[in-house]
Amino acid sequence: MAVVTLSEMMEAGAHFGHQTRRWNPKMSRYIYCARNGVHIIDLVKTAVCMNSAYKWTRNAAKSGKRFLFVGTKKQASEVVALEANRCGASYVNQRWLGGMLTNWTTMKARIDRLKDLERMESSGAIAMRPKKEASVLRHELERLQKYLGGLKGMKRLPDVVVLVDQRRETNAVLEARKLDIPLVSMLDTNCDPDLCEVPIPCNDDAVRSVQLILGRLADAINEGRHGSNEHRGGQRLK
C-alpha cells in the first residue's frame, strides 16, 4: 500500500514547482513537464521517494534515532511544531540560529537557561524580583521560548534532520552536512538533491503539501517507535 496516494498529493498541490527560470537542473529527474512557465513535479516519482523515505524514517526511529524538524517560513511553522510534537521530535520553526548544531555546547547552555527561567517563572521567583529586573528576565524568557522552545527535549545532537525548504534553511543544511547528520528533505524544483540523503520531491511552499508530507513522516516515526502504522498525519490545520 502506498504511503501517500497520487490523489492526495494532487489535492494538496504537491505537484506545483517553481517558475521554470528558477529551477535547479539537478531536479530534472523529478520534473514531469513545464506548464505556463511553471515546472510540474512528477508525482509518480514523488510517491516512490515517499515510500522510501517512510521506510528509512521508520527504521531510523525503530533503532532509537532522534529527529529534528526544521522549517521556519510562515506557511510551514505551525505544521512543523504540530507534527514534531506528535511524534516526539525536536523542532526549529522560527529562526535558525547560527551554531544550533555546530556550536551545540553553547546552544545547550542557552536551552538550560530557558529551562531555568521557566522554573523561576512558574515558582514565582521572577515576580519577586524588582520590577525592572523582572521585565528583563521575562523578555529573555519570551525570546528563548520563541527560538529554542522546540529544542527543550533535545539533550544532544539529533541523528536525523527533517527539512522543509532547503533553499531557505541553507545554514541548517550546511551544519548538518558538516556533522554528517543525514537529511530527509522536501525538495522543490529549485533545490539540490545532492545535498540530502533522503529526497522527497514536492511543493515545499503550499501549506497542505507540507502538512501531507510531514504528517506521513511523523507517522513513520511513531510506527518505528510504537509499532502503530495508522496514518493520522497530514491533516489540515483548523
UniProtKB/Swiss-Prot annotation:
SUPFAM superfamilies: Ribosomal protein S2. GO terms for biological process: translation. InterPro entries: Ribosomal_uS2, Ribosomal_uS2_bac/mit/plastid, Ribosomal_uS2_CS, Ribosomal_uS2_flav_dom_sf. One of its GO terms (cellular component) is cytosolic small ribosomal subunit. Belongs to the universal ribosomal protein uS2 family. Signal peptide: none annotated. It comes from Prochlorococcus marinus (strain MIT 9211). One of its GO terms (molecular function) is structural constituent of ribosome. This is Small ribosomal subunit protein uS2. Keywords: Ribonucleoprotein, Ribosomal protein. Gene3D superfamilies: Glucose-6-phosphate isomerase like protein, domain 1 (3.40.50.10490), Helix hairpin bin (1.10.287.610). The gene is rpsB.
